[in-house]
Amino acid sequence: MTSKIQGKKPTLSRRDFIKSAAAASAAASVGLSIPSVMSAEAQNAQKLWKWDKSVCRFCGTGCGIMVATQKDNTGQAKIVAIKGDPEAPVNRGLNCIKGYFCAKIMYGADRLTTPLLRVNSNGEFDKKGKFAPVSWKRAFDEMEKQFKKAYNELGPTGIAVFGSGQYTIQEGYAAVKLVKGGFRSNNIDPNARHCMASAVVGFMETFGIDEPAGCYDDIELTDTIVTWGANMAEMHPVLWSRVTDRKLSSSNVKVINLSTYTNRTSDLADIEIIFKPHTDLAIWNFLAREIINRNAVDEAFVKENCVFSTGFVNIGYGMRNNPQHPKFKPEERDIVAKEVSKIVSNDEGITLQYLGIKAGEEMKMDKAGAAGNHWGISFEDFKKGLEPYTLDFVANLAKGNPDESIESFKQKLQSLADYYIDKNRKIVSFWTMGMNQHQRGTWVNEQSYMVHMLLGKQAKPGSGAFSLTGQPSACGTAREVGTFSHRLPADMVVANPKHREITEKIWHLPSGTLNSKIGAPYLKIMRDLEDGNIKWAWVQVNNPWQNTANANHWIAAAREQDNFIVVSECYPGISAKVADLILPTAMIYEKWGAYGNAERRTQHWKQQVVAPGEAMPDIWQMAEFAKRFKLSEVWDKGYEALDIKPVLESAKAMGYTEEDTLFDVLFANKNAKNFSAQDALLKNEFNTEVLGDSRNVEDGNGEAFKGYGFFIQKYLWEEYRQFGLGHAHDLADFDTYHRVRGLRWPVVNGKETQWRFNAKYDFYAQKLGNGKAFAFYGNKGKDMPAGSLNAPSEEKVSIDNKAKIFLRPYMDPCEMPDKEYPMWLCTGRVLEHWHSGTMTMRVPELYRAVPEALCYMHPDDANAQNLEQNQVVWVESRRGKVKAKLDLRGRNRPPKGLIYVPWFDENVFINKVCLDATCPISKQTDFKKCAVKVYKA
């Protein structure tokens, strides 16, 4: 199939031209013949088209696409067609419905094309004023003024950037350089905090290194596919097509879907297990107990490659630790109070008995600050912690469908264990937001590895625990580049002095420039805005005021506090509407870039067309803003509370002057200018940042922008890849990626890696494993504290080349249904729309398919309240309420007691309802469970 993008001029010949070509391409893709006349017309049409490889804009699958452009008489190009790339190994020519409309997202009627500033009648900035068009110079003038006001008052902690898992890799790298290296602030955090942070911490705590061991090839090699909180049929549809193909190709292949509600993934499943929200923790522990009791542990694998570990349990829920905070409504405070202490429930009295904790006791959450601390324990202690998770206990705790018999549910749990334990079966566990957006997201991620490591079914072709990424570059940018508030590139962290030293050397910064104090994670940035501790924020490539739970608080903070909010956007979404300054931004095919997908595959693309109006790429925006800061303004002051000293004199000793700008140092230094604008890759190509373009957009100084004159994207890439070379994060050079359909890192001697940690396939496992079959080299040369089930000791245990198997108990979520709010709420996505809908709701075909978010509900729950199909209802929690239309027979079929509401529709602003509890370790918000009531509107 090919999606055609028609031009604005309604000439019949052009229309017929494109229709013929698109029809021919679509027919060919499904093996149909077409009339010879139409075929000839199509061939003539496509002679004027230029096809180039690119990457889909949407999920973390990383599908390759082909983009067709056609130039008009003035040399301006427009995208005229999109199709799947048959040479792309991920999708093999197939796209999902969103992928076919990748180009149409760029041509919405309300595309932002000029900077917009809130002003009063005199044209002066006024936070309560209305938006008015301004020049880029005027926009940067106000942006600079407000930044320096906040920075001079509060220092590096007073400013923040909301980054993205949809940044290109070079954009994310530029943002980290500017914020952490230039402004000396660690207050940059991506929306990937909402989607992948729990997976990241699960990887880091288990393996000492981030990202999956396996790859998509596991789908074709496995016998058993288990999805945990992953509606792959809608959220990763192209991968699901591969799962479907594998399932239908062999009667031996089994699919099991674990979910809190029935969805399209259930349709293919041999077994569907509907569990109560949060009880996946107990099901994983049941599996581990079964493995041990059935003598199914791969003892040789575990002895050679694993150590056992545990941590504190009284760690809170990532909420504010002050329930009397003046911004809370009275009805919010009882739930927030559990951040300080809670009463142990009857179920917790059973699951925590190994710690001597009893039901009815008060548990003080005094280890919240040490939530990530963990230590080694014995195998005997590990077994003791699993004793409560019998079939009877877990079945009664976890059964999520009231209409299902307990015996049926028990049988499903037994079958699940049978499939995992069968020594003759390969097995892959896939999960996404159901496990990541979880108040114990780190724990439940670690539990997946617990089961696979006990069985010796990890890092092997066809077997492994596999976290599926949600966003197109949550892996490649947010994680690998390190746009989180605690990270640096290649899994390094700001708190490690050696890591800061390495970074300062690559960036040519004075020693001591980087800030050692971890910055504010995504949700804390919002809370700090509410408290007045952050007074300037820049939003890039995401929509935080729609995508953050408990949204009423943050909208009030943006509009009522003394702060300045900048939003770089392509369309007027909710975040743009609450901003003080909107910067019009180039979209994916209007710039050069790269993404990294869920199987560690890095893919690059070229700019295909020029952005409309005055919209400019994010790299350009950061580079122009960097010109506004002399080194004397950002490096000549120390901050005792942050242990930051002045580094201006050290900078002078390196050859810099106090008049040099951050642009000169970070983006236009001598190394950067060695990357020529005459590069062969640029021949006959658009590159707005390097060469300028026909629009002659005004730059930050009020002059026509003619390009930087050096290949800034290539410079950023080649500098960035220095971090990973030789450190098991090796990436290929820039030119190589433009020749291939992506490579899975580490890329060593031109060879990609399919299965990490396995010496048959991984260069580093061979190099560092001392002849072993497996080497979990993220923990090479490391040790950790030993201890008991309750606490660490002074002793150490080696974890050299080993992975950790964690004991993590079941605990209740902080908010559960009760008499006043009797139903669970789960949020998520639908196939047709992407995240907040800012792009996909502008595509007519996608909008017509799903024009609004619905409230999916069980018919019996509706009947109990005399509610009917398509009736408008209120969905209300302790935090807020929204109206939505009921769907009692749609694609999502919740059990009694649970509703599902997608979050793509700003008119059904469901994040006003959601609870802002997080995993205390990963700081990732739990969007999958809170208590609500539903009633007639």
Curated annotation (Swiss-Prot):
Single GO term (MF): 4 iron, 4 sulfur cluster binding
Reactions listed under catalytic activity: 2 Fe(II)-[cytochrome] + nitrate + 2 H(+) = 2 Fe(III)-[cytochrome] + nitrite + H2O
UniProt remark on cofactor binding: Binds 1 [4Fe-4S] cluster. Binds 1 molybdenum-bis(molybdopterin guanine dinucleotide) (Mo-bis-MGD) cofactor per subunit.
Family annotation (SMART domains): Molybdop_Fe4S4
Family annotation (CDD domains): MopB_CT_Nitrate-R-NapA-like
Residues involved in [4Fe-4S] cluster binding: 56, 59, 63, 96
Localization of this protein: Periplasm
Keywords: 4Fe-4S, Electron transport, Iron, Iron-sulfur, Metal-binding, Molybdenum, Nitrate assimilation, Oxidoreductase, Periplasm, Signal, Transport
Cofactor: [4Fe-4S] cluster; Mo-bis(molybdopterin guanine dinucleotide)
Enzyme class: oxidoreductase
Chief location: periplasm
Enzyme Commission number(s) of this protein: 1.9.6.1
InterPro entries noted in UniProt: Asp_de-COase-like_dom_sf (IPR009010), CT_Nitrate-R-NapA-like (IPR041957), MoPterin_dinucl-bd_dom (IPR006657), Mopterin_OxRdtase (IPR006656), Mopterin_OxRdtase_4Fe-4S_dom (IPR006963), MopterinOxRdtase_cofactor_BS (IPR027467), Periplasm_NO3_reductase_lsu (IPR010051), Prok_molybdopt-oxidoreductase (IPR050123)
Domain 4Fe-4S Mo/W bis-MGD-type: 49-110
Ligand binding (Mo-bis(molybdopterin guanine dinucleotide)): 98, 166, 191, 195, 228-235, 433, 437, 543, 568-569, 591, 618, 827-836, 911, 928
Residues spanning the signal sequence: 1-42
Binding site for substrate: 903
Domain of life: Bacteria
SUPFAM superfamilies, sorted: ADC-like, Formate dehydrogenase/DMSO reductase, domains 1-3
Oligomer status and interactors: Component of the periplasmic nitrate reductase NapAB complex composed of NapA and NapB.
Function: Catalytic subunit of the periplasmic nitrate reductase complex NapAB. Receives electrons from NapB and catalyzes the reduction of nitrate to nitrite.
Listed name of the protein: Periplasmic nitrate reductase
